[in-house]
């Protein structure tokens, strides 16, 4: 069974009261009164959970700034892994809940990929795991399993065309730039936020960390390897949720169908920050993600047969996605607006 969960990022925009100003771009897990919308997020989470959404937790995010008399505060609600169809449903309903509550309280809520240059954009990271008979197949003997590496290889192969489902308007490609909490190249790694597919904190340790910190607690024997996922970091709030999650399922399946999957996984693995100057040689050999909707459409055109296989995507649907992306005519937009913050 293919399971997934999303990390739903959004900005809340409201008039600036001038009180307890947060530090610019330092809003990660900030508390009140510097974070202004924790209670709003908590209420959103309550309603989402009442609709059946399975939530892990919520918190304020990196993006936090003021502009022209308004506060822009980024928040995130992170879900728990569920069957992929359910994952899409709960993200869709969550966006509906957040927008409606924002309207009720007079807040402007946006899931836009990028608001302005130099500030963190809003992504929609998707975590995935493969289950069989109730057991997580992502780890074996304490390390990432062959199953997981093949799934990652499929995502490496189809990463350029997945942007057609997960990055669907021109502002998406202003987010996919170095040093802005977003990926730029096709690679993966452990606990590495410069990569496209990240393997989060490993759960292979056979210690109950809670009892280490709290010696009087009764030791738990929960199998923590059940928590292991891999995280696709390119998608954003413009994504068509159902197309995106279907596309990721196709990509992981593709990893089991290609002969050189493990070699591809080995070739695209990195264990350094690829955007640091000392690692520029490594960066040069990695394929780049598309830099526009037009480029994304071209990638989907080249790889469409894989998505149409087994009738997961119809040819008419792929045609429509390609046509919509190309209609933006944004092939040179990112280069044209480079350094022109006001025009952006």
Describe the predicted segments one by one.
Residues 1-344:
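Glycine-rich, acidic/polar active-site loops that bind/position phosphate-bearing ligands
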């Amino acid at each position: 069974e293919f399971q997934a969960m999303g990390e739903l990022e959004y900005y809340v925009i409201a008039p600036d009261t001038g009180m307890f100003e947060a530090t610019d771009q330092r809003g990660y897990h900030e508390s009140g009164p510097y974070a202004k919308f924790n209670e709003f997020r908590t209420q959103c989470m309550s309603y989402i959970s009442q609709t059946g959404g399975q939530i892990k937790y919520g918190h304020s995010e990196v993006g936090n700034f003021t502009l022209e008399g308004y506060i822009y505060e980024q928040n995130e609600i992170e879900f728990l892994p569920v069957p992929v169809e359910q994952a899409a449903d709960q993200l869709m309903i969550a966006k509906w809940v957040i927008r409606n509550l924002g309207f009720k309280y007079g807040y402007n809520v946006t899931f836009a990929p990028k608001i302005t240059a130099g500030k963190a954009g809003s992504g929609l990271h998707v975590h995935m795991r493969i289950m069989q008979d109730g057991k997580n197949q992502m780890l074996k003997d304490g390390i990432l399993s062959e199953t997981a590496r093949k799934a990652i290889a499929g995502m490496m192969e189809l990463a350029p065309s997945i942007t057609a489902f997960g990055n669907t308007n021109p502002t998406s490609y202003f987010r996919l730039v170095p040093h802005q909490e977003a990926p730029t190249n096709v690679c993966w790694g452990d606990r590495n936020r410069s990569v496209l597919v990240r393997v989060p904190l490993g759960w292979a340790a056979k210690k109950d960390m809670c009892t280490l910190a709290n010696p009087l607690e009764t030791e738990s024997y929960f199998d923590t390897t059940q928590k292991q996922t891999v995280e696709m970091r390119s998608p954003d709030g413009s994504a068509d949720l159902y197309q995106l999650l279907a596309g990721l399922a196709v990509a992981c399946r593709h990893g089991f169908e290609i002969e050189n999957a493990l070699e591809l996984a080995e070739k695209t693995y990195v264990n350094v920050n690829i955007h640091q100057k000392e690692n520029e040689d490594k960066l040069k050999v990695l394929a780049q993600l598309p830099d526009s909707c037009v480029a994304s459409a071209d990638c989907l055109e080249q790889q469409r047969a894989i998505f149409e296989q087994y009738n997961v995507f119809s040819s008419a649907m792929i045609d429509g996605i390609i046509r919509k992306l190309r209609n933006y005519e944004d092939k040179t937009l990112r280069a044209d607006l480079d350094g022109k913050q006001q025009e952006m």
